[in-house]
Design a protein with these regions (language model features):
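Conserved P-loop NTPase motor core of helicases/translocases
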Residues: 165, 173-263, 300-315, 366-367, ...
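Conserved lysine of the Walker
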Residues: 156-157
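Walker A (P-loop) phosphate-binding loop of P-loop NTPases
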Residues: 153
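Conserved helicase motor core of SF1/SF2 NTP-dependent helicases
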Residues: 171, 181-184, 239-241, 258-553
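Pre-ATPase regulatory/linker segments immediately N-terminal to the P-loop/RecA-like helicase/translocase core
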Residues: 18-143, 201, 207, 214-221, ...
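Short hydrophobic/aromatic beta-strand immediately N-terminal to the Walker A/P-loop
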Residues: 146-149, 177
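Short Lys/Arg-enriched alpha/beta "domain-start" segment
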Residues: 3-25
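Post-Walker A alpha-helix
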Residues: 160-161
Length: 553
């Protein structure tokens, strides 16, 4: 309770004092998402985008154009990303949006007045549990908790979908509440359930809103009475649990107060411990299935005392092989067959993070793609020069974070080469991802790519930090490990020594993993111990590894 209070009063310097005031954010780039008529992506925000924006609807955006008057439009639902905001427009606006020349849009702005005090609502709900002072959240955990440990692309979402479908087939009365940290995670599971089900999933509901056009037929609003159906599976973001619910003819029924037959928490590594504890101790007599990967991204919180805390740190679940959990030994279902990556890439992150216990579905013979004169292997290391006081090779600061100009420009050029060579011989869709540890580095690369002409429409590009890539995958992944200023004196505090961050970064690639990293002559390189560990593991399978210098490229 004390930590919730601190988090409630705290926040980063940029967001302190925001509650109760209007928040203004401007974006200097607006693009329609490829393949959609109603989804738009706003990029390069003037400030950080609050996560609670995902929990509100009817978001009004003001667009400024070079050739017409300003235009105000409302959007139904948002996906918050570190450098962008993904918005889905109402179907009623589709014709209006399609008539707009978006290349003439110079700015988009949003003024947020009706904020949701998520931490305050969580605090109130937690206090409503009536727990005694000094109540030990860890020692009172019980065996109603079960875990699914799902490393990257081991079929976790499919496993959850089949479990839900199986329960609906087995029990004539079955009410399930699914909670996940983001709209994206909610939508991914809902889509997988529809994909795996042989019937029409008449019992499947997405609470309040969805960012996916294909799921609009299962969205239910607060007036609905679906919670009284004999069979229902309601999927919601975890942040709504403390305060939201149904208020139709049946009266006001919070999600917290409805009697469910099972609670399922997905992508659990990203769920703050206080939110998870609320779910656990509110539904003490209900089976709770917790699914995720302890070695993926942890919650974003401000208070140092619980910054990296989640349900996995509480129960000490941090390994695949022979885990010993606390305070009791919980039931754990381990998923071990990874379906995404070529064996060389899969074995790299298996040895790095999962005790070498993953098996690999794909064949090493599947990938025969060539990129011109560049003889790439499944795993590729390209070191770049770092010189302390150099304007191009030195470590710079942008918005208080680390950037390295040469690695930005080099990444752009090798990206352009890969795209150009791919387009010569291939028409099928291909995805390229560029992941960086620091947001400004990713922003610089993305802004340059957005200005690059003649990128083929069949090449999908994603650029961001690891938070953008959680749960995602690309055929070709660039991992751009630009160095921080503190790697010589504060090695334990830098992102490049965060095992979870590096694990997410290297496990997104399907066919090619290209790691750009500081040259071994860089001052302080020996302190990049996680990168060195990855290199040592990779070189055990040297036949599937290529090393190039930037000059050679």
């Amino acid at each position: 309770d004390a930590l919730i209070e601190l988090e409630y009063r705290g926040g980063t310097e940029e967001t302190k004092g925001d509650f109760g005031k209007s928040i203004n954010i401007t974006f200097n780039s607006v693009n329609k998402e490829q393949g959609s008529e109603r989804i738009y992506v706003l990029r390069n925000p003037s400030r950080s985008i609050p996560l609670w924006l995902e929990e509100i609807g009817d978001i009004e955006i003001k667009f400024t154009f070079s050739d017409r008057d300003e235009l105000k439009l409302k959007f139904e639902v948002a996906n918050v990303r570190e450098n962008s905001l993904r918005l889905k427009a109402s179907k009623a606006f589709e014709d209006v949006l399609n008539k707009i020349a978006w290349n003439k849009c110079t700015k988009a702005s949003i003024t947020l007045k009706n904020q949701i005090d998520l931490m305050g609502k969580l605090r109130s709900a937690f206090n409503g549990l009536g727990l005694e002072d000094g109540f030990n959240l860890k020692e009172n955990l019980d065996d109603n908790l079960k875990f699914i440990f799902g490393p990257p692309e081991t079929g976790k979402t499919t496993t959850l979908a089949k479990k839900i479908i199986g329960m609906m087939n087995e029990y004539s009365t079955c009410r399930i509440l699914v909670l996940a940290p983001t709209n994206t995670a909610c939508d991914e599971l809902a889509k997988k359930i529809k994909e795996c089900s042989k019937d029409d999933c008449a019992w499947l509901y997405r609470f309040v809103s969805t960012a996916d056009e294909s799921l609009e037929d299962i969205v239910v609003d607060r007036e609905s009475m679906v919670y009284e159906d004999e069979q229902c599976c309601v999927i919601s973001t975890m942040a709504r649990l403390p305060f939201d619910g149904f208020n139709g003819e049946g009266g006001y029924n919070k999600l917290l107060d409805i009697v469910w037959d099972m609670i399922l928490c997905d992508e659990a590594s990203m769920i703050p411990l206080a939110e998870m504890a609320l779910a656990i101790y509110n539904f003490v007599n209900t089976p709770i299935l917790i699914a995720g990967d302890p070695l993926q991204i942890k919650p974003i919180l401000h208070e140092e005392e619980w910054k990296d805390e989640n349900i996995y740190t509480m129960v000490n679940l941090d390994r695949v092989e022979n885990p010993v959990t606390e305070p009791i030994q919980f039931a754990i279902e381990n998923l071990s067959m990874q379906y995404r990556s070529l064996p060389a890439i899969g074995e790299l992150f298996s040895q790095y993070a999962y005790d070498g216990k993953l098996r690999h579905y794909r064949s090493a013979m599947e990938n025969h793609m060539k990129f011109g004169k560049l003889n790439l292997k499944p795993i590729n290391f390209i070191p770049f020069k770092v010189e302390r006081y150099d304007s191009v090779f030195g470590i710079k600061k942008l918005d208080g974070s680390n950037v390295h100009i040469y690695s930005v420009l080099f990444t752009l050029e090798i990206f352009k080469y890969i795209v150009r060579e791919y387009a010569k011989n291939h028409e099928e869709e291909y995805s390229i991802g560029i992941v960086c540890p620091y947001s400004p580095q990713a922003q610089l690369i993305e802004s340059l790519i957005m200005q690059t002409p003649n990128i083929p429409v069949n090449v999908k590009i994603t650029v961001g930090t690891v938070h953008r890539f959680q749960g995602g995958q690309c055929n070709f992944m660039f991992v751009v490990l630009n160095p921080p200023a503190g790697m010589k004196v504060a090695a334990d505090r830098i992102f490049l020594n965060n095992k979870n961050i590096l694990n997410v970064a290297i496990s997104r690639a399907q066919d090619f993993l290209c790691i750009l990293l500081p040259h071994c002559d860089t001052d302080g390189y020996e302190n990049l111990y996680e990168i060195n560990k990855i290199g040592r593991i990779a070189m055990k399978d040297y036949a599937n590894v290529a090393q190039y210098t930037c000059d050679q490229i």
